[in-house]
Amino acid sequence: MMTKLDPYFGEYGGMFVPQILMPALKQLEAAFVDAQNDPSFQAEFTDLLKNYAGRPTALTLTRNLSPNPLVKIYLKREDLLHGGAHKTNQVLGQALLAKRMGKKEIIAETGAGQHGVATALACALLGLKCKVYMGAKDVERQSPNVFRMRLMGAEVIPVTSGSATLKDACNEAMRDWSASYDKAHYLLGTAAGPHPFPTIVREFQRMIGEETKAQILEREGRLPDAVIACVGGGSNAIGMFADFIDEPSVKLIGVEPAGLGIDTPKHGAPLKHGKTGIFFGMKAPLMQDKEGQIEESYSISAGLDFPSVGPQHAHLAATGRATYESATDDEALAAFQLLARSEGIIPALESAHALAYAIKLAEAATEETLLVVNLSGRGDKDIFTVADILEKQQANNEESGNE
């Protein structure tokens, strides 16, 4: 089937969906290409980003975070965006696109709840009906975001099938869309899934890297040595990387969740430890067992708890243009606390994975180095999770001290 845009990134990507969804994907691709070439669409999108969401976001030089005087660590402050994370960028773009296509209803999936909140706010703003699928486990661990979504008029549907996490919410959302695409738009939350979603999401997130490039040149007079972002599905990372891909002097570093350790079954690092397979409408690295069944991914952060990754990240890894590392729960937790104590900024646990790796890089540096970390979201949603963990750790320490 002919497409207007290339559905593949190297060998990854594609449109592996039931035939019934092909017309919906074709319609979406055509509408996207048309909108990208329409100055009035771009003007409305830019206006919403500026006057509703609060772009451009700040680029903050940390004062106390870097463990090495040779290393400057800047934070791209997507946590300051309306809605609390980078998710708002592309949600506004897709919601405008849905209205342009005459859709009345939005279907979405969410893990940490940030994409759900962003979708709910865009639907409230633009007068669209909103339905959000969320794994039952995530509904429990992200109750503040569930309340926010419902407050803004969204219907939140807990998904109890499978592992009751993000991948199951994705499956249910896709199932719903296949029965209702004539009136509904599936507002996918990450740079993954069938074509044209990975391309649409990248283009509606690329202002992260564009702003970063302009801001760092203004502040430092040069490009950074590396840009670092956490990777679940990969939307915040591809938004940061997109404008730097053609700058060979800039290292692109994605940080996957190592969970309890890469050598344990409890992690979410398909790029480093997955096998290529077909999942969620795309060909991409995937966490699979010996029989080829999809393994449950694991991370302390609900937003990184995804067993696959966007196809462009897979291609960037395969070609060597980007490198993908990992950070454990404990490392992310330490970085979460360190940023709060050293800079007065509470990051999302997702973003804390990228911070953890940046701190490692800084410790090892032997020459002047300029790092930019994409602080993809704020940590309000995670404070109860972190409080519980720290309380348990303290209780364990006290117990071992009494033995």
Curated annotation (Swiss-Prot):
Catalyzed reactions: (1S,2R)-1-C-(indol-3-yl)glycerol 3-phosphate + L-serine = D-glyceraldehyde 3-phosphate + L-tryptophan + H2O
CDD domains in the cross-refs: Trp-synth_B (cd06446)
N6-(pyridoxal phosphate)lysine modifications at: 87
Keyword Isomerase: no
An example Gene Ontology CC term for this record: cytoplasm
Main EC class the enzyme belongs to: lyase
Pfam family, one: PALP
A GO molecular-function descriptor: tryptophan synthase activity
Residues forming coiled coils: none
Keyword Amino-acid biosynthesis: yes
Superkingdom of origin organism: Bacteria
PANTHER family, per the entry: TRYPTOPHAN SYNTHASE (PTHR48077:SF3), TRYPTOPHAN SYNTHASE-RELATED (PTHR48077)
Subunit structure: Tetramer of two alpha and two beta chains.
Summary of the function given for this chain in its UniProt record: The beta subunit is responsible for the synthesis of L-tryptophan from indole and L-serine.
Family membership: Belongs to the TrpB family.
Name the record gives this protein: Tryptophan synthase beta chain
Biological source species: Shewanella loihica (strain ATCC BAA-1088 / PV-4)
